[in-house]
Amino acid sequence: MQGRTQVAYNGSFGISTVYKNLKMLSGDEFRSVASERGISILDKGNNTNFQKEIQQTGLQQNHHVAFYGGSSTSSYRVSLGFMDRQGVILNEDMKNFTSNMNMNQKMFDGFFDCELGMFGSILKNHNLVDYQKTFYSAATFNPTYPNHKDPVTNSWDGITTASQITNPLAWMQVDDDDATSHISTHARFTFNLMKELKLVLFGAYTYNIVENSQYLPTSVWANGQAYKGTKKMESLLGNMMLTYKKGWKKHFFDVLALAELQKET
């Protein structure tokens, strides 16, 4: 099917869920044990399982589509991809977009061969800031507390006397995001000057940027905290290669000359 554009697609879909949780006291069991042992507790009258409150069913999907075609002297391929991953914890997810293009063209009866390519991607993550505090708090936080904010103060109820234990639902409102954007291009020109002599010119450019942002409200961090940062990187590469290969009687000559320049910022 030379000369005709063909299309290929593949995709997948999945679900992830928590298999097992730590066995902790429910609100009713907590009250019962406290009553039996004569222990005074702060009872807000609820029966909340905070481990399950911060969990979700994570949906996962992948999609990839490609367009390609060509002939004996020219060919091309363009592809697009998308990946979406939800974690089993609220507000934990990853998205990735990719694109790729390659083209090859031969001209002048094989004297000149041109190859061009470009790749780009965008990766976005929403992360959990502190795994230890999140899961420790979910397992040990007072189960008589509600699973919603105080309607009067519009804030999460906390326990000021508890060390390293914060309302786990407050951790779900923390923002910790990072995004990575990447693009790379290249070009290769091959000149078949003679049967034995070949000249190759190659150039490539890469650009990468990483952005980080974080926001911790006062409900989980004493005075609150906010951060935003950006890191950029550029790379430029170029080289020229001349090769000569020749067989003569019982001998074989293979000569290579190479010049290269690279710059990174």
Language-model regions, residue ranges each:
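Transmembrane beta-barrel domains of bacterial outer-membrane proteins
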Residues: 71-75, 79-82, 87, 99-104, ...
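A beta-strand signature from Gram-negative outer-membrane beta-barrel systems
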Residues: 1-8, 60-62, 81-86
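Outer-membrane beta-barrel transmembrane strand signature
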Residues: 41-68, 73-83, 152-192
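Outer-membrane beta-barrel channels and translocator barrels
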Residues: 60, 71-72, 107-110, 192-194, ...
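Surface-exposed loop/interface segments of Gram-negative outer-membrane beta-barrel transport/assembly proteins
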Residues: 2-46, 88-92, 98, 102-182, ...
